[in-house]
């Protein structure tokens, strides 16, 4: 379910996860928005590919005509700081603040060295961080997820925490966000990989009953 942003939000509708208003648009149905700015995106997309921030109806028309996805997800645009929370085996890890030097956290900002600054633990207030961690854990549990997942959020200037998506297969390079968060609680990249491999070959019950990480932390991504 988590691979589909619209299906994920539908599954989380009756939870305490703070969702951004949206609507699903079929290909061939010209979109009209009651929110400006708004965001047009591929509900099955990743790495911010095919994400358009539209400030006017003309922007929305341009985004629509230049996209070739089967469906579109139209959302109200939320201005704020992006953060991410890793969850592993029902445990949340420190919040990471993501601050692109220009624009938003798009494909270039994600994968070009020096384009984005990361802060872990996040300098945001403990209340905001706790809120994000609680929402991430609730989404993880509601979707019956296991192993590693990473939930992304937007935090407004007023301190509201809005859920963006939860990634069941987050990046796992030495410079990815999950290892970055793990390092903040003393888990090295090799240790993180070892824990992932261990849990991958265990059933949930075996994993929870027979294995405890030596430093007391389950990894996060």
Residue ranges and their predicted role:
Residues 126-221:
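ATP-dependent carboxylate activation and anion-phosphoryl transfer catalytic cores
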Residues 35-37, 82-84, 150, 163:
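Broad gene-expression machinery/nucleic-acid interaction feature
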Residues 1-80, 221:
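Active-site nucleotide/adenylate-binding loops and adjacent lid/helix of ATP-dependent enzymes
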Residues 55-134, 155-162:
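Phosphate-binding site of ATP-dependent enzymes
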Residues 48, 117-119, 173-178:
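Short small-residue beta-strand/loop micro-motif enriched in glycine and branched aliphatics
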Residues 5-9, 60, 104, 175-178, ...:
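A general structural signal for well-ordered alpha-helical segments in protein cores
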Residues 15, 66-68, 111-114, 139, ...:
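Alpha-helix boundary/capping residues
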């Amino acid at each position: 379910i988590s691979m589909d942003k619209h299906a994920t939000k539908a599954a989380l509708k009756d939870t305490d996860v703070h969702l951004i208003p949206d609507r699903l648009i079929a290909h061939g149905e010209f979109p009209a928005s009651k929110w400006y700015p708004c965001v047009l995106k591929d509900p099955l997309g990743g790495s911010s590919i095919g994400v358009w921030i539209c400030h006017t109806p003309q922007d929305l028309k341009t985004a629509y005509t230049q996209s070739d996805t089967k469906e579109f997800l139209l959302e109200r645009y939320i201005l704020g700081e992006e953060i991410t929370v890793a969850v592993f085996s029902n445990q949340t890890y420190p919040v990471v603040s993501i601050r692109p030097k220009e624009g938003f956290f798009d494909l270039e900002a994600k994968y070009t060295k020096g384009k984005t600054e990361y802060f872990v633990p996040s300098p945001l207030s403990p209340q905001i961080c706790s809120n994000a961690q609680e929402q991430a854990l609730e989404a993880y549990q509601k979707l019956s997820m296991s192993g590693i997942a990473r939930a992304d959020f937007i935090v407004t200037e007023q301190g509201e925490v809005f859920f963006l998506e939860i990634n069941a297969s987050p990046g796992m390079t030495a410079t990815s966000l999950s290892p970055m968060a793990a390092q903040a609680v003393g888990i090295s990249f090799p240790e993180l990989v070892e824990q992932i491999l261990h849990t991958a070959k265990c059933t949930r019950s075996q994993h929870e009953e027979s294995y405890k990480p030596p430093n007391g932390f389950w990894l996060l991504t």
